[in-house]
């Protein structure tokens, strides 16, 4: 299941409502046959207006407190709390993902790896970012998201997997090494593109068939 809340919302009342909504999803996840409930982690700049110097530290402490609470709830119900990093969010790099896993040492926390979210506009660094992800938390990945990066001049945007500048074949082969048979969800894809995209992905990485 996905319950994409803002775990670092600056308004504590709204943040509490978001946390409670996520906990409800954790309680009922097994009824839907879902082993996990996933979320992203809120904007890195959430507290910048409040404290231009220490805003990242404030956001981190807020995120850690939320993750601790949600991990405890996940443990009660035997499901995973899935954390997805994004280059503009509190978990903005593979190193930060590793840090939260170390600071909240719960076996019920897993990683939803969307490499394009970590890469953002830094396509030239994608191999390093992907390799860092597998090196730092490859054993904790519980789901992969797959899309592609397309460039229009200086702008980058996401679209269907396999036809952009993301090194899809290399990623799928690394994923097979670290997490064979893992589920992969296609994102940023239109209905009429599904069959064509799946066929292309099977051609790019036959090992995933």
Name what the model sees in each region.
Residues 7-111:
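Active-site acidic/histidine proton-transfer and metal-coordination neighborhood
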Residues 33-35, 68, 91-209:
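Histidine-acidic metal/acid-base catalytic patches
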């Amino acid at each position: 299941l996905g319950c994409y809340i803002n775990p670092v919302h600056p308004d504590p009342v709204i943040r509490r409502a978001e946390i409670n909504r996520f906990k409800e999803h954790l309680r009922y996840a097994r009824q839907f046959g879902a082993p996990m409930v996933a979320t992203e982690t809120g904007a890195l700049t959430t507290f910048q207006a409040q404290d231009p110097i220490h805003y990242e530290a404030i956001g981190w402490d807020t995120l850690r407190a939320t993750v601790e609470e949600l991990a405890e709830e996940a443990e009660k119900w035997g499901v995973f709390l899935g954390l997805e990093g994004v280059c503009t969010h509190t978990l903005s790099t593979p190193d930060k993902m590793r840090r939260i896993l170390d600071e909240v040492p719960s076996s019920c926390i897993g990683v939803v790896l969307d490499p394009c979210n970590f890469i953002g506009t830094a396509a030239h660094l994608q191999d390093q970012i992907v390799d860092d992800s597998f090196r730092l938390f490859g054993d904790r990945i519980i789901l992969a998201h797959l899309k592609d990066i397309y460039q229009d001049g200086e702008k980058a945007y996401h679209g269907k997997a396999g036809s952009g500048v993301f090194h899809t074949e290399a990623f799928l082969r690394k994923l097979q090494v670290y997490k064979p048979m893992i589920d992969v969800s296609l994102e940023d894809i239109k209905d009429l593109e599904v069959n064509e995209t799946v066929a292309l992905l099977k051609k790019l990485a036959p090992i995933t068939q």
